[in-house]
A protein has these predicted regions:
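Hydrophobic helix-and-loop "lid/oligomerization" segment in the mid-to-C-terminal part
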Residues: 1-43, 63-64, 114-218
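Hydrophobic, small-residue-rich alpha-helical packing segments that form membrane-like cores
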Residues: 2-103
Length: 218
């Protein structure tokens, strides 16, 4: 969602692909890459995965498609030969904080592309950082603090509807995210299509957001 919103705001023609984790696993896979590239895509940007996708990136390169990897998982012996690899612990980098969540790494790319500090995305960063169960220190602590402020001041309509369905009227804090919002969003991965989550978080219409929130709440 974070990078889709970023790229759309820059005028890019964007489509998203969320793999079925039961059929395709968590990381990139050759079948998905082939299907995406054959549809006419010329650039694939991964979020929270890809650092182990050496063969998949090689396939994409052979088919004329660039790949940008954003990931925070452990770097393997071989790093994919992607157009760019954005990772807080990249051996050729000197980033001072290596414990960013996957969404935090994606946020860094959004920041660079937009050339402004995209504070309007910090609600997503806060939710993703808490959900990823990374250390809430350093930048992660700042992201979560700023994101929670945004969630309380101007929550996305989908989040607002989800909280209303459960009669949660208190201020959102780390516990609200960790014990309610994040588990609800994670449960979407067990649905027939994880695209529900994308539609839910990007919903702008209250009616649509309520329908999606009810589906998630079931």
């Amino acid at each position: 969602v974070l990078l889709v919103e970023t790229l759309v705001s820059l005028g890019a023609d964007v489509s998203s692909y969320i793999p079925n984790r039961f059929e395709e696993g968590y990381g990139p896979n050759k079948d998905a890459f082939s299907k995406i590239i054959k549809s006419g895509i010329s650039l694939i940007i991964t979020v929270d995965n890809g650092i182990a996708g050496v063969d998949e990136v090689e396939l994409a390169n052979s088919l004329g498609c660039d790949v940008i990897i954003t990931d925070h998982h452990k770097i393997q012996d071989e790093i994919p030969k992607a157009y760019a690899v954005i990772h807080p612990e990249h051996p050729e980098g000197q980033y001072p904080f290596g414990k960013l969540a996957g969404v935090g790494v994606a946020f860094k790319l959004a920041h660079a592309l937009l050339e402004i500090y995209p504070d309007f995305l910090l609600d997503l960063v806060a939710i993703g950082t808490v959900a990823d169960m990374v250390s809430l220190t350093d930048e992660n602590r700042i992201f979560v603090k700023q994101g929670i402020e945004l969630l309380n001041e101007d929550p996305r309509i989908g989040i607002k509807m989800l909280l209303e369905l459960s009669n949660i009227t208190t201020n959102i804090d780390e516990q609200t995210i960790g014990f309610y919002i994040a588990p609800k969003l994670n449960s979407i991965g067990r649905m027939d299509s994880a695209k529900v989550g994308l539609s839910f978080l990007m919903a702008e219409d209250a009616y649509d957001a309520k329908i999606l929130a009810e589906k998630i709440e079931e």
